[in-house]
Amino acid sequence: MEHGCMAELGRRVRIGGPYFEDLAHGRVFADAPSVTLTDGLAAVSQAIFGDRLRLPLDATLCAAVTGGAAALAHPMLVCNVVIGQRTGPSQRVRGNLFYRGLVLLRPVFIGDTLRTRTEVVGLKQNAVREGRPATGLVALRVRAANQHGEPVLDFWRCPMLPLGDAGVRTGHADGFEDIPAELEPGQVAAAVPEGWRLDAFRDACPGEHFADLVDGTLYEVESRDTVTCAPELARLTLNMAQTHTDAAASAFGRRLVYGGHTISVAAAQLVRALPNLVTIVAWRGCDHLAPVFEEDLLRSEVEVGSLHPLDGGGGLVELRVVVHAARGVTADAEEARVLDWRLWGLMA
């Protein structure tokens, strides 16, 4: 049984998430608590990642650019909260394979409240391998809205879940072809916030802006970050995946770092390469290539891709961030590629 809020007297009820065979196409999860983004949430997230993205840090600049009094919530804080809200169906996750088609449809500010809805849109049982637990892939469509019912985030993710009964043959064999492999430029441009004064950002912030970028430039961020506070971030964002807080639930015998933690480190390192990044608008895709563990040392390579000017100045830039991990405290250990993140950023 997945959960038991209405247990009969004297009945023993185990509380936990579904196994792969418990899920069905079209099943919707919409029972997660809504979350109001607060200064406290933002401060704890900032303490973990030390991100230098300007608008969430600078109230004066934020007001000049956005025209509002509220502070912009960091896009990664928004993503982490929404992902955490939606871990109900993936509490038993063995690992998350990818994110696809993530678009931040409108800005989110401190004080906004996020509500999410997740639908099972694809199921694929993996081939049984000797000596390994039986598993399956679950394609989830996640949508989030603010307190006004306005959509703020839309994406697909693919967790791998174990089967409760290794002998079950579900027949699920979806190919996930309906999950978009790419985002169209027009789709991303439609998510650029209306009315933002990118000229005010350019005037206030010295250094490279959109017009200074060169397609094909590769930035190697030398300063590495040690992964810390991984269970704390999971709890902060209501992430219920057992593998992030319980080593016994991990396929590796040690706690697995939540994928958004690694992406957030990558985002912070991205801003070191591009200090005048205005915000993140969308993710073309994000693949977890290998697991990340606490105390790993992460470094990023940032590649500038295609540049898309906007009519009012500034533009969208396609970026690719590849993250490498050296394991544990052995700073000189051989590195592993752990993340391939393709995103769209807004520059002034």
Please give the residue ranges for each predicted region.
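Hot-dog-fold acyl-thioester-processing enzymes
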Residues: 2-99, 153, 163-181, 186-283, ...
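HotDog/MaoC-like acyl-thioester-processing domains
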Residues: 3-25, 110-191, 294, 303-348
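A generic structural signal for residues embedded in beta-strands
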Residues: 31, 116-118, 221, 300-302
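Short, low-complexity cationic-aromatic patches
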Residues: 67, 73-74, 105-110, 257-258, ...
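Long, hydrophobic/aromatic-enriched structural stretches that serve as scaffold segments
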Residues: 82-83, 102, 107-117
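A cross-kingdom feature marking solvent-exposed beta-strand/loop segments within repeated
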Residues: 95, 99-106, 121-126, 279-290, ...
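Extended hydrophobic/aromatic segments used for targeting, binding, or gating
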Residues: 282, 288-300, 312-314
